[in-house]
């Protein structure tokens, strides 16, 4: 499945569980992240490694030369971002980035990063997450779909009560899940439990995941509607 398919599927999977524009960006970031193990390694991944590695290195220097300037939060942030890019850098295509382990790990980091940046602006935080997994060409294309999803949200005007870091993590989870589901529908399948198992999820398992997602979506919207009555 190409970027367009993953973008559309990411929006579909994310919409039932989000209620704001920044969450659209986060869902799209999750939907596009797994394919950082592919052709964009030379572009997006290496750029991310240089930036995050620079943040970590500068903080280490500050720690040894002037501890008063050392920023623990910035250091941790740099390490987390570095980990996000190291996974696809050392992964084969449809390797570690296409697993449930990576889904949980990366979603937590991207969501937490957005949560920490939300003091500036929640929309800015979501957009930064999307920028981390795209280049200027892909970002321009994806934003067209993001604006459409934004319009749909404006019409539906949902009120899903999720707060704190979870508010930023969940959209990434559902976006990421959409990517794995999309790839189960292809002949190559997905080794979602790699490296513990090489068993491939294919269409049958993909349909099961879609059914689970649909049940969760129905439950969330049923709860939301009942809370309004």
Curated annotation (Swiss-Prot):
Keyword Chaperone attached: no
Keyword Transmembrane part of the UniProt annotation: yes
Signal sequence segment: none
UniProt keywords, alphabetically: Cell membrane, Membrane, Transmembrane, Transmembrane helix
Residue stretches spanning the membrane: 8-28, 49-69, 70-90, 113-133, 136-156, 162-182, 208-228
GO cellular component annotations of the record: plasma membrane
Membrane topology: Multi-pass membrane protein
Domain of life of the native organism: Archaea
Compartments (UniProt record): Cell membrane
Main subcellular localisation: membrane
Name this polypeptide is given: Uncharacterized protein MJ0790
Organism: Methanocaldococcus jannaschii (strain ATCC 43067 / DSM 2661 / JAL-1 / JCM 10045 / NBRC 100440) (Methanococcus jannaschii)
Source lineage: Archaea, Methanobacteriati, Methanobacteriota, Methanomada group, Methanococci
């Amino acid at each position: 499945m190409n970027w367009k398919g993953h973008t559309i599927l990411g929006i579909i999977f994310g919409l039932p569980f989000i209620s704001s524009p920044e969450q659209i960006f986060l869902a799209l970031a999750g939907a596009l992240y797994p394919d950082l193990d592919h052709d964009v390694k030379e572009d997006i991944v290496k750029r991310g490694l240089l930036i995050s590695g620079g943040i970590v290195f500068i903080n280490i220097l500050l720690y040894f030369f002037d501890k008063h300037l050392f920023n623990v939060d910035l250091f941790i942030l740099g390490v987390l971002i570095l980990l996000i890019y190291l996974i696809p850098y050392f992964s084969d295509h449809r390797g570690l980035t296409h697993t449930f382990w990576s889904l949980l790990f990366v979603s937590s980091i991207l969501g937490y990063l957005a949560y920490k940046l939300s003091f500036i602006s929640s929309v800015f935080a979501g957009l930064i997450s999307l920028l981390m997994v795209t280049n200027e060409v892909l970002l321009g294309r994806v934003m067209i779909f993001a604006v459409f999803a934004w319009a749909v949200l404006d019409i539906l005007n949902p009120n899903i009560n999720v707060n704190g870091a979870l508010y930023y993590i969940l959209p990434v989870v559902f976006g990421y899940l959409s990517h794995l589901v999309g790839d189960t529908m292809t002949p190559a399948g997905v080794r979602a439990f790699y490296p513990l198992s090489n068993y491939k999820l294919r269409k049958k398992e993909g349909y099961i995941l879609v059914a689970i997602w649909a049940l969760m979506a129905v439950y969330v919207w049923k709860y939301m509607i009942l809370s309004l009555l």
